[in-house]
Amino acid sequence: TVSPLPRYTRPREESVVAPREEIIPFAQSDAAIDQSPLSAGSRALLRGLLRVGSTRMFPGGGAGIEYGGLLKTAARPDYIAAHVVEAADHLRECKTDLLLVPGMSGYPVGAMYALAANTPALLLKKSKLGDANPNAYPAGAFVIPSYTGEGDVVMHADPAAVKDIVATIVARKLAEQTDQPVIELDLRVAGADDIIDKATMSQAVSESAVVIGEEAIGHCLAQHRLETADRRPANIHVSVVAWVTPLIKSYNRPREHLWQSFKLQPFAGLDLYTVHLDPPAIGVTGVGCVGFAANGAGSS
């Protein structure tokens, strides 16, 4: 059975061999970070990543960064609190109404962003793709390969959560427009994830956000008309206005992809221009290529 859901593919990436002498040893990383133009939030984030993380091969995506103890399996205010505040400031500057976060791995930091920015967030849950009833998934669902090698999975929002959150937003916007001849229902959505790799997931979530938002607002407007005598014409517009993430792999050109597709520049704590497996190291824009504290540290 061919699923009617939108399907996205992730290209595999390989690591780049780097001469050992070009890598700043972990023992010298503090000095390099202090001399960098990174913000306070990005400096603390990088120190935490180098201390608890490493690099390794992932079954579903090739060479990548293992950062579970920083962003997925622990909450470390000493390393990420300042970055969360900076990202929340960006969300507020973009006048974000709603945040979408894909999968459980992105939700810890996504929830932190949401609370810091005082913005409601929706988790796009990951489910195994089943052939029994491919039409059973809610609006905005899509299929994408799992980064951990589990095969194709379906990402979708909780319809009950969507309904309540969007209803609250729409009610506020309607209350602000009681004297207007035309109702303008604009929903400004942002995305958040623990990392932006090739922007495949970012594109999928952004396109999903428009579908989710338009359907939910349409239902809210119909309910409003049923309950009131309001028959004013209405315009519905859902736009993706921001992406926030601790990490972005700039060597995969995700910034260019998001600009071309959505005319937005993602906000990232650390811009990574290369990832090395042997020895484990990452190239960080503004700092250089820096080694991790321990080989194979922080696996999950």
Where in the sequence are the language-model features?
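Short glycine-rich phosphate-binding loop at a beta-alpha junction
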Residues: T96-G103, V244
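Short, glycine/charge-rich flexible loops or terminal/linker lids adjacent to PRPP-binding catalytic cores
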Residues: N118-V189, A199-Q203, G283-G286
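Active-site-facing substrate-recognition patch
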Residues: V16-T96, H156
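Short, ordered loop/turn segments at secondary-structure junctions
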Residues: M104, K126-K128, I248, D271
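Short Gly/Thr/Asp-enriched flexible loops that form oxyanion-binding sites at enzyme active sites
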Residues: P108-N118, A204-S208
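Structural motif
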Residues: L98, R188-A190, A242
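PRPP-dependent phosphoribosyltransferase catalytic core
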Residues: P4-E13, A18-P37, S208, I212-S300
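Gly/Ser/Thr-rich loops at beta-strand to alpha-helix junctions
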Residues: G103-V109, D197-A199
